[in-house]
């Protein structure tokens, strides 16, 4: 597992990276994570999140545009454990998570807005691998995202930690 330090990436690639507005907190068991972006756009329905974490996620980060909803949790312990088991590097969720005491012990990165105990409805509604924009940044499938306790940033190309 590669360790990323976002301030060092910003210093090394100032013209390449875009930094998200500082509204995310780290809820996962990894302090830092990064990888190729897979996007989901959904609202209070995590059907596609469930579907994607069951697939191989090696080298990938699931970016979920949940519309910023603070009324339902798009990720909980069971889906986080599936994501870890299937090799996902992490998830960036523009929305809420739950089961935070378990998430922090799960070997996957999780950045989200807040915690909320209510689960979502599963209606099968959402879009996969579409361009999404939140926190002042646009996420394109196939580009790259990096996160740590300092923040979250996006790059059109893979980044290497400076020596």
UniProtKB/Swiss-Prot annotation:
InterPro entries assigned to the protein according to its UniProt record, in alphabetical order: RraA (IPR010203), RraA/RraA-like (IPR005493), RraA/RraA-like_sf (IPR036704)
Binding site for a divalent metal cation: 99
Keywords, in A-Z order: Lyase, Metal-binding
Domain of life, source organism: Bacteria
Range of residues in the leader sequence: none
Binding sites annotated in the UniProt record for substrate: 76-79, 98
Protein family (similarity comment): Belongs to the class II aldolase/RraA-like family.
Physiological role: Catalyzes the aldol cleavage of 4-hydroxy-4-methyl-2-oxoglutarate (HMG) into 2 molecules of pyruvate. Also contains a secondary oxaloacetate (OAA) decarboxylase activity due to the common pyruvate enolate transition state formed following C-C bond cleavage in the retro-aldol and decarboxylation reactions.
Protein name: Putative 4-hydroxy-4-methyl-2-oxoglutarate aldolase
Organism listed in the record: Pseudomonas putida (strain ATCC 47054 / DSM 6125 / CFBP 8728 / NCIMB 11950 / KT2440)
């Amino acid at each position: 597992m590669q360790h990323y330090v976002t301030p060092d990436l910003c210093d090394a690639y100032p013209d390449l990276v875009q930094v998200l507005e500082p509204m995310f907190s780290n809820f996962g068991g990894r302090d830092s994570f990064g990888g190729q972006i897979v996007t989901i756009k959904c609202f209070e329905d995590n059907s596609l999140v469930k579907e994607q974490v069951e697939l191989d996620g090696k080298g990938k980060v699931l970016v979920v545009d949940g519309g910023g909803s603070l009324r339902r949790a798009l990720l909980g312990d069971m889906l986080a454990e599936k994501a870890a088991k299937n090799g996902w590097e992490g998830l960036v969720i523009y929305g809420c998570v739950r089961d935070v005491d378990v998430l922090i012990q799960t070997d996957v990165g999780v950045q989200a807005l807040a915690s909320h105990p209510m689960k979502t409805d599963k209606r099968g509604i959402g879009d996969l691998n579409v361009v999404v924009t939140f926190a002042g940044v646009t996420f394109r499938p196939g580009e790259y995202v990096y996160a740590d306790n300092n923040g979250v940033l996006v790059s059109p190309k893979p980044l290497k930690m400076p020596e």
